[in-house]
Design a protein with these regions (language model features):
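Redox- and metal-dependent alpha/beta enzyme cores, enriched for Fe-S-associated oxidoreductases
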Residues: 161-189, 202-209
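Short acidic, glycine/serine/threonine-rich loops at helix termini
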Residues: 12-18, 45-49, 72-79, 178-180, ...
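Peripheral docking tails and interdomain loops at the edges
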Residues: 217-308
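Glycine-/acidic-rich phosphate or pyrophosphate-binding loops and their flanking alpha/beta elements
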Residues: 142-165, 178, 298-314
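Terminal amphipathic helices with adjacent charged low-complexity linkers/tails
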Residues: 66-104, 209-246, 253
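Conserved thiamine diphosphate
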Residues: 15-67, 91, 244-260
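Conformationally flexible catalytic loops at phosphate/diphosphate-handling active centers
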Residues: 61-156
């Protein structure tokens, strides 16, 4: 099965139904694969990957994108032709899926009880399925790329090939970061972003493949908060990846942003890269707010440079 989810806030000190990643991050241990998009066009392009990979890979998918910021955005996009999608569909896998579906004509028992003598072994038996899933996702991303002329991958890098400062994020903030990165690189700086596409299963080798060898400082952005944790989910995944790869010389920082649909404008991304210029940047930080309690916030760069393309007109409706 595939759940297409507009990621939203889990209410805490007050009710908030707006956009962040706190709900989907609460699903990490369910065993669902997790695919994420950062724009309306990407939702159109990559949602079929979740459905096609779920059928062939035999793993349920949680396909998510930012609530409101992406889910409610009006945008001109290129739509799929159903004939193209049909060409990519593995009908043999569909037939196997249907054959295994619950049916009173050929009943099967699911969810039987197991004691401690065998439960652990059976729980580990699914490892091979999850180990094989990234290759299935890559296969369908390659098919999408062939049809659309795109370059989707498990992780995509954007920016200077010899960047010394890199941010890692997922969701709609990536589009904002692209504009800031273009602006800074045009000024002679060397920065970039790694965009997460397949969040679960996590593939360390795919992340390391796109991380510039020149990267000295890496900032990971999470759109959720786990009180009491050493760091937020994406940060911890990246930290483990760098540690296991022996990249102990890379300075790693982690920050929170955009909780409850808090805006993350270019000024926040400028603040992030400015902080990374320091010899010892903050290990933990927040973007887009003024934290006068614990002092974690980074000062916004204001007035922020204009990063929009020349001739762009901006309008506000209310």
């Amino acid at each position: 099965c595939v759940f297409d989810v507009s990621a939203r806030t889990v209410a805490t000190q007050s009710l908030n139904i707006f956009g962040d990643h706190s709900d989907v991050m609460a699903c990490r241990q369910t065993g669902f694969a997790m695919l994420v998009e950062s724009s309306v066009q990407e939702v159109m392009d990559l949602s079929p990957v979740a459905h096609l990979a779920a059928i062939e890979g035999k793993v349920p998918f949680l396909n998510f994108f930012d609530g409101f910021r992406t889910s409610h955005e009006y945008q001109k996009i290129e739509k799929w032709d159903y004939a193209d999608l049909k060409e990519m569909c593995n009908m043999k896998a569909v037939e196997e899926f249907r054959a295994k579906a619950l049916n009173p004509e050929h009943p099967k028992m699911r969810g039987s009880h197991e004691n401690g003598d065998v439960f652990f072994q059976h729980r580990e038996a699914c490892n091979s399925v999850y180990d094989a899933l990234p290759a299935v996702v890559e296969k369908y991303m390659a098919k999408i790329n062939e049809k659309l002329g795109t370059n989707y991958d498990l992780f995509n890098y954007y920016g200077a090939p010899d960047a010394d400062r890199v941010m890692i994020a997922m969701g709609s903030v990536c589009d904002v970061a692209d504009e800031v990165i273009d602006y800074l690189n045009a000024k002679g700086e060397k920065v970039g972003i790694i965009k997460v596409r397949l969040y679960r299963p996590w593939v360390s080798s795919a992340l390391l493949k796109v991380l510039p060898a020149t990267a000295k400082k890496v900032a990971v952005l999470d759109r959720t908060k786990e009180p009491g944790s050493l760091g937020e989910p994406l940060y911890l995944d990246v930290a483990a990846t760098l540690r296991e790869a022996g990249k102990n010389d890379v300075i790693l920082t982690g920050g929170r942003y955009g909780l409850g649909s808090k805006d993350t404008p270019p000024s926040s991304i400028f603040a992030l890269f400015k902080e990374l210029e320091k010899d010892q940047p903050k290990e933990r930080f927040t973007l887009g707010i003024t934290d006068d309690v614990t002092g974690l916030s980074l000062p916004e760069v204001k007035p922020a440079p204009i990063t929009a393309a020349a001739g762009t007109k901006e309008c506000k409706f209310w």
